Design a protein with these regions (language model features):
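Hydrophobic ligand-binding cavity/cleft-lining segments
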Residues: 1-58
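Short coil/turn motifs at beta-sheet boundaries
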Residues: 15-17, 61-63, 72, 101-103, ...
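Short, surface-exposed coil-to-beta transition loops
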Residues: 19-21, 75-79, 101-107
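Glycine-rich portal/gate segments that line the openings of hydrophobic small-molecule binding cavities
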Residues: 25, 54-99, 154-159, 163-164
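A short, structured loop/turn motif at beta-sheet edges
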Residues: 27-31, 82-87, 109-118
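Generic detection of well-ordered alpha-helical segments
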Residues: 31, 75-78, 142, 146, ...
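Hydrophobic pocket/interface hotspot
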Residues: 32-37, 43, 68, 81, ...
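Beta-strand/loop substructures that line and gate deep hydrophobic ligand-binding cavities in soluble
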Residues: 96-147, 154, 163-164
């Protein structure tokens, strides 16, 4: 049985016009996946469209309450880590700099399996900016996360193979 997302009240799926989930079994360890997800320098290697991640609190890796700026979904985004449980779950919430009233909350759960781990990612989005983007390409967010999971898995498997 997999865990559930700990949604902030305001960002629960029942309150969000955009909500999607993606999952994937990965033949890589929880530790490798966690290292990639929490290392901002690694994101451009697997996160579609991400060219940079800047941590704003002097940290070198994501941790509880870390604030950061990046470019997600073609948008310059300000975000902060709102849930952090090492090796198990991480979530961040934020908004595009050009539309502060359009919010997003993106959560991850990593569960060990016999052959590696199970990745579950779920996101909710609210506000006119995200809604307009979804109208233009209804499946874009879900498809981007499908690519994200596949690319993250490929990088993780390659990293483990290089250590063998």
């Amino acid at each position: 049985m997999y865990e559930t997302i700990h949604w902030p009240e305001a960002m629960k799926p029942s309150r969000s016009p955009i909500h999607f989930t993606n999952e994937l079994e990965v033949a890589a360890s929880v530790e490798t996946i966690w290292d990639l997800l929490t290392d901002p320098a690694a994101w451009p290697g697997f996160y579609p469209g991400v060219q940079h991640v800047q941590l704003l609190d002097g940290h070198t890796c994501f941790g509880a309450d870390t604030r950061f700026e990046t470019n997600l979904a073609g948008q310059d985004v300000y975000a902060s880590v709102q849930e952090y449980e090492a090796m198990t779950r991480i979530a961040w919430g934020g908004y595009p700099k050009i539309a502060e009233h359009s919010k997003a909350y993106h959560a991850w759960i990593i569960t060990p399996t016999a052959n590696g781990c199970h990745l579950w990612t779920e996101e909710t989005m609210q506000g006119p900016h995200w809604i307009e983007l979804a109208k233009q390409a209804p499946d874009i967010f879900w498809l981007t996360h499908e690519k994200l999971l596949k690319d993250l898995a490929a990088v993780a498997v390659a990293r483990e193979a290089s250590r063998a």
